[in-house]
A protein has these predicted regions:
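Generic non-transmembrane alpha-helix signal with a bias for helix starts/N-cap capping motifs
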Residues: 8, 62, 104-105
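Secretory-pathway/luminal and periplasmic proteins that interact with or process carbohydrate-rich
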Residues: 34-39, 64, 83-89
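Immediate post-signal peptide segment of exported/extracytoplasmic ligand-binding proteins
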Residues: 58-74
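An N-terminal boundary/leader segment
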Residues: 1-50
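Enzymes and membrane/adaptor proteins characterized by extended Gly/Ser/Thr/Asp/Glu-rich
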Residues: 70-110, 114
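Long amphipathic alpha-helix in the N-terminal Rossmann-like dinucleotide-binding domain
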Residues: 51-56, 112-116
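Non-membrane alpha-helical structural segments and their capping/turn regions in soluble enzymes
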Residues: 23, 52, 105-108
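Conserved small/polar residues in nucleotide/adenosyl-binding loops
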Residues: 120-123
Length: 123
């Protein structure tokens, strides 16, 4: 079965059982994005470097057996109407906004607390 066809629950089990690293999973999503980005154009904001940095941090925490959140190391995409301090949020507007918000929406706070890696914002 293809990696990106697995459910979040299946991916989390593979991460927990150390059959997969967060870096490997994020690289699979990056590869998928690069393959289809030109035609799909569904990504408003994408920071590959930050994503891989967060994934590496998650993998290192897993190796050190630190207390892990329920979504630890799982890449999660956000809709562009959800405010996040890590990425510009356009709230669906067609204007180009370069500035990031200072605040995270409550759902973003909860995702981060659970250990998720923010993948990108989608249109």
């Amino acid at each position: 079965m293809k990696l990106l066809n697995l459910s979040a629950q299946q991916l989390l089990k593979k991460l927990k059982d150390k059959q997969l690293t967060s870096v490997e999973l994020c690289k699979a999503y990056i590869k998928q994005k690069k393959k289809y980005d030109k035609n799909v154009q569904a990504w408003e904001y994408f920071n590959e470097k930050k994503l891989l940095s967060d994934a590496k941090k998650s993998d290192n925490q897993r190796k050190k057996l630190k207390s892990l959140g329920v979504l630890h190391g799982l890449p999660v995409a956000l809709k562009d109407i959800i405010s996040t301090s890590e990425m510009p949020t356009k709230y669906g507007a067609r204007i180009k906004l370069k500035k990031k918000n200072n605040l995270d929406a409550k759902i973003v706070e909860l995702l981060k607390k659970a250990g998720a890696c923010l993948l990108y914002t989608s249109d």
